[in-house]
Amino acid sequence: MHSDELLVEILVEELPAQALLNEYKEMPKKLHALFQKRALEVGTIEVFYTPRRLCLLIKDFPLLTQETKEEFFGPPVKIACNHQDKMQGLNALGLGFYQKLGLKDHQHFQTAFKNNKEVLYHAKIHAKEPTKDLIMPIVLEFLEGLNFGKSMRWGNVEKSFIRPIHNICVLFNGENFNNIEVKEYGFKTKQATKTHRQEGFDFIQVDSPKAYFEVLEKNHVILDPKKRKAKILQEIKELETKHHIIVEIDRDLLDEVVAITEYPSVLLGEFDKAFLKLPSEIITTSMKENQRYFAVFSQKSQEESPTLHNGFIVVSNAISKDKQKIIAGNQKVLKARLSDAVFFYENDLKKPLDNAPLESVVFVQGLGTLKDKMERESTIAQYLTQKYAPSLNMPLEKALELIGRAVKIAKADLLSEVVYEFSELQGIMGYYYALKQNENELVALSLKEQYLPASENAPLPSSVFSAIVALSLKLDSLFSLFSVGKIPSGSKDPFALRRLSFGLLKIIAHYGLEFDLKADLKNLFEKVGIYQSFDLEILEKFLLERFNNLIDCNPSIIRSVLNTNERDIVKIIQKVKALKRFLDDPKNAQKKELLFSAFKRLANINKDRNPNESSGFSISLFKELQEHALFEAFNAIKTSAFESLDSKIEAYFGLHAPLEEYFKSVLVMDKDIEIQKNRKNFLWGVYQSFLEIGDIKEIAI
């Protein structure tokens, strides 16, 4: 037998769920890297976890290391030997090389060739060694390499970790790993484990991976998080069927309850129906954030949408036959939480949105208060309302009044007691408060939707009205934060401006709104007039970089369109998609190289051209038939009115044949300078015309 199964358990105090989940996916990769570092070839690597243990299971862990050769290259023989003759023996330089390696016998030294020079050489062979001596150093290096964000020290230990470590149990090939002092973390190892807390506090001896798994299974520890998740989902499904309810499975919450339980049990509790007078988001958020409960819904018929039910799902880690006692305890805690929520909500309803003291809250240092931000957004909203008035289906005067009102009260809920308790309800609470205070429904809904989209695939504002309110918020945040240097760099983006920018582009694209990233940004910056001066091209470039996330496409096609003067967001997307359709068309697939060869040559001829240079040309200076043929084909395109971008692109790429003939027969760099200049100007005109769609030299096929 050359290998065996290796199991390592790190027993810890309860790990914080979110930190554990964030780092868990990296653990197998980090472990694999440590094995590679030591040239250990292993089988599959699995990492399991519960709140109080990490378990590393490695199949086919070798019993012995591989035999390795370590090579050392010294100085050139010419300068390391006496009289430049290696037969005369080594001089001080040569002797020094071997002495550094701890070698005394230099009589039969070796040489080798490196970089075409003969140099002193020595090879050290490392024989196979038992791998058992490497296991603990690997485990300790693994622990030190984990990144949980925060760590702590306890007692007089040398190293820190996210929570105190109580034991490292190593099970491998019957070897003895007991009583190894781990001074870094302040304990001696035991080949033992602990089970579920309710099963006992003592260590239980184990002597093999098989015995380890059996002990945990018999004592209410489900080691594999996938199995714990499956158990939770199965028990939820059974409760749904039994009680005719619908449980909303929040995936983040599901992962969290898997991470905080060793033996999960799913229980159904209920709360007083009187609490259902609260907005449903308050109840579901309170249950999730404070108690880690799943929300329950009921549905009277298939035609009706599910409504919040006065029930909740709790995932318990307790081992108890008295389930009702556990449920009763959770119901009592939830009642207190929801009673607090009622108090906050009713207090908020007493305060008019108009009276929110926005001037008392600083937006960002150097950018004024929330009131200042609201006033800047109002100016932006007025500009956008006038620009998009035809899409609002209401008189301009009415639109200006309602959107102005929406922006004025949009930030009021940030000062509410409910949002102070649950920040994720910002905007949502503004919607409910606005309805209760008899605001226009469009105004109220725009408050709810002002922060949308919340993520890449999340819903967008449901109307152009809401879109204008959302765009005003996003544009002001970009202008103001860029103006004080809060620009994302590398992985740092504390104000989530990349997500915000993506949302801005997605809203504009979804509603087909005209927005020029050069002209409109400049107009808005000047109209608001109070931002600190900064180079708007930096913001323009930042927004252009987001197109790679916005469009699922070959990046070079996106780059080709962005390399033109086109800065209208919708037109950029239309051109990219049209080029993609053309290049994806099966009829063009086989001739892409042919299509692009002439256009690439056209681009190369013009690559150093000054765009401001005069580009006039005269047909009278054309000498070759191919010049006239290309001009006629090009002129036919220039004077045509195309039904679509697709037909225009088709026509432009149709120039490849006359272009090929042109380059075969016409010498652009003619000896006659006037003819040469005329030809270059003509080709520049053809190239410039294609820039109406994209920069062909950027497209990679």
Swiss-Prot record:
Superkingdom classification of source: Bacteria
GO cellular component, one term: cytosol
Keyword Hydrolase recorded: no
Keyword Cytoplasm among UniProt keywords: yes
GO molecular function annotation: ATP binding; glycine-tRNA ligase activity
UniProtKB keywords: Aminoacyl-tRNA synthetase, ATP-binding, Cytoplasm, Ligase, Nucleotide-binding, Protein biosynthesis
Subcellular location: Cytoplasm
Catalytic activity line of the entry: tRNA(Gly) + glycine + ATP = glycyl-tRNA(Gly) + AMP + diphosphate
EC number(s) from the headed UniProt entry: 6.1.1.14
GO biological process, one term: glycyl-tRNA aminoacylation
Enzyme class: ligase
Subunit organization: Tetramer of two alpha and two beta subunits.
Annotated family: Belongs to the class-II aminoacyl-tRNA synthetase family.
Descriptive protein name: Glycine--tRNA ligase beta subunit
